[in-house]
Amino acid sequence: MGEQRLDSWREADTPARAEFVDVLFRRHYSALLRLGVVMLGSREAAEDAVQDAFVALHRHRRSLRDPEAAEAYLRAAVLNRCRSWVRRQVTQRATRPLMLVRDHQESPEDTTVGRHEVESLVAVMRTLARRQREVLACRYVLELSVMETAQLLQISEGSVKAHTHRGLRSLQQRIEVAL
């Protein structure tokens, strides 16, 4: 990326930055949202995580050395926000046993894909170990390679392969039991 474009990206409110963020949003929002839904089991919480990631990208744009790394930054930001959300939920459930009411409004995506199937898969995914769920979400929702998944989660490629294998095996067993 040219030095002039990089300088434009870092400026406060330039058309280049606004266009860059708009392009990132259009290209990656859906995949990031799917990642969040798989990790959290809640579309609303996933939307918040993705929105927060884009806000953080805007807020920290001056420290982003390479705008080409923005996609990886967004993935990591969404994943970290999902982890934080899960930790908060565990803490809240442990300290106050209240049921969280989910918003059951159907989105056009839910209707198209088959809301029941999506909810069933998300429910089964939520029973997996956290790391298995993260790896499977990266590999099959975001369609990242083993290397990209390892970099995003900051684990070895061998760990990605092992968690993928174990996670898929567990998913298959749980789905067979559910049928």
Which functions belong to the PLM regions below?
Residues 123-126, 130-134, 142-159:
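Helix-turn-helix DNA-binding module
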Residues 1-31, 38, 118, 123:
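N-terminal module of bacterial RNA polymerase sigma factors
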Residues 12-23, 33-52, 62-68, 157, ...:
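Short, charged helix-capping/linker segments at alpha-helix termini
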Residues 19, 23, 101-126:
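Acidic, proline/glycine-rich intrinsically disordered inter-domain spacer in sigma factors
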Residues 2-12, 20, 93-96, 114-115, ...:
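C-terminal edge and immediately downstream basic/flexible tail or linker adjoining helix-turn-helix-like DNA-binding
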Residues 59-65, 76-97, 106, 114:
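Arg/Lys-rich amphipathic alpha helix in sigma70-family domain 2
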Residues 48-55, 68-80:
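Structural recognition of an alpha-helix C-terminal capping motif at a helix-to-coil junction
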Residues 79, 83, 153-179:
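DNA-recognition helix of helix-turn-helix
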